């Protein structure tokens, strides 16, 4: 990049903090093409300053990147500790790497309708249907009130950031945990996320993109990850330095997930369902 703009290492330097800010705020990709484009913009700005003998944008200025690259396009994933029922953190894999996502469920008086929003694909919607049917068949083992008449309630499942398309089976256990939390009004444990496919029998199946999901969890300061026991081999293949500070809980069934993910504490002002 420097040679292409007629410059050398003495003309332009970039410190590690700025580089991290570029990666985190302006690029989110599996490669480095967009990173190179952003750095090229900084180099061109520096070249212009040299020619005009001015220093309009000082790299020590906190607005340095904003002045040249514009406002941030991406923001650091952050785990949210919710005190309401039905909100669970999941891990997803996209074309640009791992992401965390929040599954939100709510219930209201109605006629038994299930609404699913958040720009979700067919597979993810099917996971929501499977989760609800599993709950109806296993309410007793999940600690859910057997007297609930589902035909008298509407259930709404939402995944925020609706502008971003989402699909795949890996949110299955997150959706089911969200619904169980909603029906029992129990809190989800702090700093925990999960990923895994579910079946109508309540089995937890393995999913892909594990390394990318681990990196997303670390960015969000998540401490524990629930995943299928079949994914254990994928964890063993990941460089140990990426696993530091993380605890993995391997499960075979959804009952294992609920047992570990939910606390016995009710949320504040629980709903009577």
Report residues per predicted region.
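Conserved C-terminal "switch" segment of AAA+ ATPases
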Residues: 1-40, 45-58, 141-148, 186-189
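Peripheral, non-AAA+ core regions of ATP-driven protein-machinery
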Residues: 57, 74-80, 84-89, 97-273
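Glycine/threonine-rich ATP-lid/beta-loop region of ATP-binding domains
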Residues: 28-91, 123
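Broad structural signal for hydrophobic residues in well-ordered alpha-helices, predominantly aliphatic
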Residues: 1, 22, 65, 179-180
């Amino acid at each position: 990049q420097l040679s292409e703009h007629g410059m050398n290492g003495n003309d332009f330097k970039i410190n590690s903090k700025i580089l991290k800010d570029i990666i985190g705020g302006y690029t989110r990709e599996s490669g480095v093409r967009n990173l190179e484009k952003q750095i090229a913009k900084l180099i061109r700005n520096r070249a212009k300053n040299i020619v005009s003998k001015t220093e309009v944008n000082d790299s020590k200025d906190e607005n340095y990147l904003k002045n040249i690259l514009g406002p941030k396009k991406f923001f650091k994933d952050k785990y949210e500790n919710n005190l309401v029922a039905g909100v669970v953190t999941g891990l997803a894999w996209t074309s640009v790497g791992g992401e965390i996502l929040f599954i939100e469920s709510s219930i209201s008086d109605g006629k038994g309708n299930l609404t699913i929003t958040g720009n979700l694909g067919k597979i993810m919607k099917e996971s929501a249907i499977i989760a609800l049917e599993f709950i109806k068949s296993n309410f007793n083992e999940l600690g859910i009130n057997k007297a609930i008449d589902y035909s008298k309630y509407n259930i709404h499942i939402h995944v925020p950031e609706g502008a971003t398309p989402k699909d795949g089976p890996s949110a299955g256990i997150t959706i089911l945990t969200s619904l169980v939390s909603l029906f029992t009004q129990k809190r989800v444990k702090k700093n925990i996320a999960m990923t895994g496919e579910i079946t109508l029998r309540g089995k937890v199946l393995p999913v892909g993109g594990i390394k990318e999901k681990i990196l997303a969890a670390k960015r969000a300061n998540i401490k524990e990850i629930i995943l299928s026991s079949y994914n254990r081999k994928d964890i063993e293949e990941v460089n140990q330095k990426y696993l530091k500070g993380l605890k993995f809980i391997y499960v075979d069934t959804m009952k294992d997930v609920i047992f570990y993910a939910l606390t016995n504490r009710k949320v504040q002002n629980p709903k009577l369902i």
